[in-house]
Amino acid sequence: MALRKGGLALALLLLSWVALGPRSLEGADPGTPGEAEGPACPAACVCSYDDDADELSVFCSSRNLTRLPDGVPGGTQALWLDGNNLSSVPPAAFQNLSSLGFLNLQGGQLGSLEPQALLGLENLCHLHLERNQLRSLALGTFAHTPALASLGLSNNRLSRLEDGLFEGLGSLWDLNLGWNSLAVLPDAAFRGLGSLRELVLAGNRLAYLQPALFSGLAELRELDLSRNALRAIKANVFVQLPRLQKLYLDRNLIAAVAPGAFLGLKALRWLDLSHNRVAGLLEDTFPGLLGLRVLRLSHNAIASLRPRTFKDLHFLEELQLGHNRIRQLAERSFEGLGQLEVLTLDHNQLQEVKAGAFLGLTNVAVMNLSGNCLRNLPEQVFRGLGKLHSLHLEGSCLGRIRPHTFTGLSGLRRLFLKDNGLVGIEEQSLWGLAELLELDLTSNQLTHLPHRLFQGLGKLEYLLLSRNRLAELPADALGPLQRAFWLDVSHNRLEALPNSLLAPLGRLRYLSLRNNSLRTFTPQPPGLERLWLEGNPWDCGCPLKALRDFALQNPSAVPRFVQAICEGDDCQPPAYTYNNITCASPPEVVGLDLRDLSEAHFAPC
């Protein structure tokens, strides 16, 4: 985020020059015309002239320069000096470049900047000084650049700012001071920046914010204070930022937020307080934030939610409360959040959710309760959440799913119940989930499935039952799942599959039977595109001839191995997933792959 706007400006500038097809004057000697009429180019640089826009750009990037090149044409509009070994800029070094609008000095060895170094650059709009060794900047450094719109000073060693350093930069929109060593800022640090839209102070050592600091920044839209050492947010600190839309306070040491800390932020849309030490929220923590859309409070130490904490956040769309210490959700814990669409409560210490805890959340689409230890959910606990389409309950110690647990979730599309230690799901537990597309029951302790468990789930496409203890599946168990596309019953204890089990699944394309106790299997349905059979004790007699023929005729559906898809250098050497069909009997073919058996072996069939 720290380099977002500066990087964007760089990219847009480059793209415009490439798209317009400028003429290159690479290697032309100073004072010698290039391949067409145009200005001379310094020997160490490449010059690019845009006829249509009548603009000249000079590229001297990464040339190991220890001093500024001689002979830069006076009409240059953009000068790139990044990635060199410049340790200083002499006074008035650019005084003949009055047309310069873009100057890139980032990635060098600049330890200081002379007050007169930028003399003559009255038309400069974009100045990049990131990734140097700057420790301080003298008053008057930017006195000669009144037209600056963006100034990048991130990733230096600045430990202090002079009062009024930026005074006179009334056109500045974007100021990046991130990733320096600033511990204290003077009251008048940003005096004169009345047009500033984005201010980045992330990655410093700020421990305190005084109300006067942001005085005069009435046009500010985005303020990044993340990754500092702030311990508290006091009242009225941001009261003079009426147009602020995004405020980043994440990854500090904030333990307390004073009542009225965010007063005056009428335009705020995004507030990030994640990765702090906040232990509690008061009823008047968020008053006046009527326009807030996103509130991130994850990775704190919040132990409880007081009633009406969020009462003023009528337009909030995303609330993240994951990785806290919340133990209980009382009735109407989220009162006032009628527009909320995403609610995350994962990895808290939730043991109890009261009936009515989610009342009023009529627009919630995604809810994450995973990583808690709920053990038992009240009947109809999700009543009123008709627009919920994804419910995450992974790793929640549920043990058993009872009827009416999911009553009211008529629009649910995805239900994740992985890793819950489930020993049973009662027959009517999933009834009413007519829109369900994906059901994940992976890594539980299910030993059987009720005959009519999936009744009414006619739209289900993905059913994941791997890593349970299923020894058998009723012949009619999957009958309602006529739209099933993906079925995974791997890592169970299945010894046989009824012949009619898969017959209704005409749309099935992916079937995993890996690591069971199957001895025989008739391939069906006919449209399978991927069939996994590894890890079963196959009896390679006559009943398995049909499977052998299917595997040989459809090698892409029953591959011997598949190379893992990796990004970057994650797979060195390449990783493979094998799909052996290893014979466990009869004795004469033990250890062979079914596909390698000859026709003669099956002649008696």
UniProtKB/Swiss-Prot annotation:
Q: Which residues form the LRRNT domain?
A: 32-74
| Principal cellular location given in the protein's record | secreted
Q: What is the lineage of its organism?
A: Eukaryota, Metazoa, Chordata, Craniata, Vertebrata
What does this gene product do? Answer: Involved in protein-protein interactions that result in protein complexes, receptor-ligand binding or cell adhesion.
Q: Name one GO biological process term.
A: cell adhesion
Q: Give the UniProt entry's GO cellular component terms.
A: extracellular exosome; extracellular matrix; extracellular region; extracellular space; insulin-like growth factor ternary complex
Keyword check for Ligase:
no
The molecule here is called Insulin-like growth factor-binding protein complex acid labile subunit
Q: Which GO terms describe its molecular function?
A: insulin-like growth factor binding
